[in-house]
Regions:
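Conserved hydrophobic register position within alpha-solenoid helical repeats
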Residues: 507, 538, 571-572
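Amphipathic alpha-helical scaffolding segments comprising HEAT/armadillo-like alpha-solenoid repeats
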Residues: 483-495, 516-528, 546-560
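Local sequence-structure signature of Cys/Sec-based thiol-disulfide redox active-site neighborhoods
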Residues: 36-47
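Short inter-helical turns and helix N-cap capping residues of alpha-solenoid HEAT/ARM repeat scaffolds
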Residues: 497-500, 530-532, 563-564
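Hydrophobic membrane-insertion alpha-helices, especially the h-region
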Residues: 9-23
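Primarily the internal scaffold of c-type cytochrome electron-transfer domains
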Residues: 26-29, 43, 51-119, 123-130, ...
């Protein structure tokens, strides 16, 4: 070819064609669609994600569980005795081993080696491995703030000695690590219970909550990263779920399995999966939640967060929490005002919170996310992020943040012994529920004081008017107490388009117990709801209202093909 320009043009064209072929090949060569990732360990992740790995180290996730050794054990094992309900236990060292001398499964005192520790703040728990492979969590725990031993008694039996054959005894099934705790404290847990020998051979990839608990197993991601391709895989993306997707559902539902009260629908959940394909959250049932949806029992945060306006608006966990340290992203009211950037001075001023700046009452979370103490020393905040409602407290007996704070302050100031008998608001509420007249009177008195204060603050305002409107607390309270207006109130909750799905599902469950023609029609209609939790709960509860099996099958059969496993399972049952 004599024309140099033509030669150059051909060379450029050929290079372009070859580059295009190479790029197309690079794109088309993909990992098979059915390939499934395996766990590679956090040390592998750290090679490329060093900053995130170091942020995670020392976090509550990193220290969720550990082997008991000099670096992890916080409790005093220097031959220290602790007595509770007539049982004297002794914590001591045997060389490098941490030991406890306490009542065993047969009721006699014996020595047990502490093999594992749980957590570090505000308490640390200790675990013993029994000969059959069962790992049991001791009720004697270490208060890491007060630096003392305490007995973590079950909330409903605070003053009883637990017999060795009681399921709540530390050797019983309710304190069994494999059944009650393990999958949320370790990564890739395999319980491995052998039915023939009735023994456990439990294994995990990593002892703590590591990278792959939240991001999913990383082998495909590592394989793709090491391939140095110009593209991520056309089948598997970058080999991990996209938790930063615009839809907050993917992130929230990756946290939910371990931060919710739920039961399993199907095994082997992996991050990025649909929560309701693997779990069903507990509804706002009596004993778990107060009638207005505030947390009561140890329900964690997912169920309350589902009720919040924040969830409805797309707020996600990492808007407030650093995902690696788990710490809050901002201190004080900046946590809220970093998003609620309304005209200056609208919220973080006495005109809004009516308290001295810098005091507890001036903190957003104290009013809108009150804490309830669990395990005696562990305060956990309600994530429904609601306005305090002393009016509902007076009317229905539900708690409110104002009464909680002021009642605890009064008990400390008076020092009449109430602060020992009821160290926290939740303890006073529980005492009142058990029939303690003094607790009931004290709570009622402060409730009325708080109602009077808020009525004065918000007289003739929009908030004053809004609080006269029905709240789903009225419906759930009426249903729990069997009041005649329950059906009407529940129907209004179900028909309200702004009702959070978890509340709607709870109302459906109550309507099924009423068993009238109108309530049955509403349950049938709810089987077509856009929310799968509502659909699944409706199916399960329709059976209570359908004496005719043929009618029931006709109504339920189409939902055997529902895209969500929880709904299909409910239909099959």
């Amino acid at each position: 070819m004599k024309n140099p320009q033509l030669r150059l043009l051909c060379a450029v064209a050929l290079s372009g064609i070859l580059a295009a072929i190479w790029l197309l090949t690079d794109y088309l060569v993909a990992i098979p669609l059915e390939s499934r990732a395996d766990f590679v360990g956090s040390a592998t992740c750290a090679k490329c994600h060093e900053a995130q790995f170091h942020s995670w180290q020392g976090s509550p996730h990193d220290r969720a569980m550990d082997l008991a050794n000099t670096e992890t054990v916080l409790g005093d094992f220097n031959n220290v005795s602790f007595s509770y309900q007539g049982v004297s236990s002794r914590m001591f060292r045997d060389g490098d081993r941490y030991m406890i001398h306490t009542e065993g499964p047969d009721g006699t005192l014996a020595n047990f080696e502490v093999k594992y520790v749980f957590g570090f703040d505000p308490l640390q728990q200790y675990m013993v491995e029994l000969p059959d492979g069962r790992v049991q969590v001791l009720r004697i725990s270490w208060d890491s703030k007060a630096h003392k031993w305490f007995y973590h008694y079950p909330p409903d039996v605070p003053d009883e000695k637990l017999a060795p054959d009681d399921p709540l005894h530390w050797t019983g099934r309710m304190s069994n690590w494999q059944q009650m705790c393990a999958e949320c404290h370790s990564t890739n847990l395999q319980k491995n219970f052998d039915i023939e020998t009735a023994c456990y051979q439990t294994h995990f990839s990593e002892i703590d909550v590591s990278c792959e608990t939240c991001h999913g197993p990383g082998s495909l991601h590592v394989r793709l990263a090491e391939a140095h391709s110009l593209f991520w895989d056309r089948h598997h993306g970058y080999g991990l779920p996209n938790l930063k997707d615009k839809n907050s559902k993917f992130e929230i539902e990756s946290c939910a399995p371990c931060h919710s009260r739920r039961h399993r629908v199907f095994p082997d959940f992996r991050p990025g999966g649909d929560f309701l394909d693997y779990y069903e959250p507990a509804l706002l049932r009596e004993g778990l939640y107060h009638a207005d949806g505030q947390i009561l029992d140890e329900v964690y945060v997912y169920g309350s967060f589902l009720q919040s306006k924040m969830h409805a608006k797309g707020v996600r966990c990492t808007d407030c929490h650093d995902p690696h340290t788990t710490k809050l992203k901002h201190e004080g009211n900046r946590l809220c005002t970093s998003c609620h950037q309304h005209p200056a001075g609208k919220y973080d001023v006495p005109a809004h919170h009516h308290h001295q700046p810098g005091s507890p009452g001036a903190q957003c979370v104290e009013c809108h996310m009150p804490a309830t103490h669990y395990m005696l020393v562990d305060p956990r905040r309600d994530h429904s992020i609601r306005n305090p409602r002393p009016d509902l407290s007076v009317e229905l007996g539900t708690p409110n943040a104002c009464t909680g704070c002021h009642l605890e302050m009064e008990m400390e100031i008076r020092d009449r012994g109430d602060s020992q008998k009821w160290p926290h608001y939740a303890d006073a509420l529980a005492a009142a529920t058990r029939g303690d007249a003094t607790a009931e009177q004290e709570i009622a008195r402060v409730n009325h004081q708080m109602l009077a204060a808020t009525e004065k603050w918000y007289a003739n305002t929009e908030r004053k008017t809004s609080e006269k409107l029905p709240h789903y607390a009225h419906a759930l309270d009426a249903a729990r107490k069997g009041k005649p207006q329950a059906e009407e109130l529940l129907t209004a909750v179900v028909n309200n388009k702004e009702t959070p799905p978890i509340v709607k599902a709870t109302a459906i469950e109550h309507l099924a117990n009423i068993n009238s023609l109108s309530s049955r029609a509403l349950v049938v209609e709810a089987m077509g709801d856009e929310n799968p939790l509502v659909r699944g709960v409706s199916i399960r509860n329709l059976a209570q209202q359908s004496p005719n099996a043929e009618d029931l099958i006709t109504a339920v059969a189409p939902l055997l093909d529902d895209p969500v496993r929880m709904v299909r399972t409910s239909a099959a049952q």
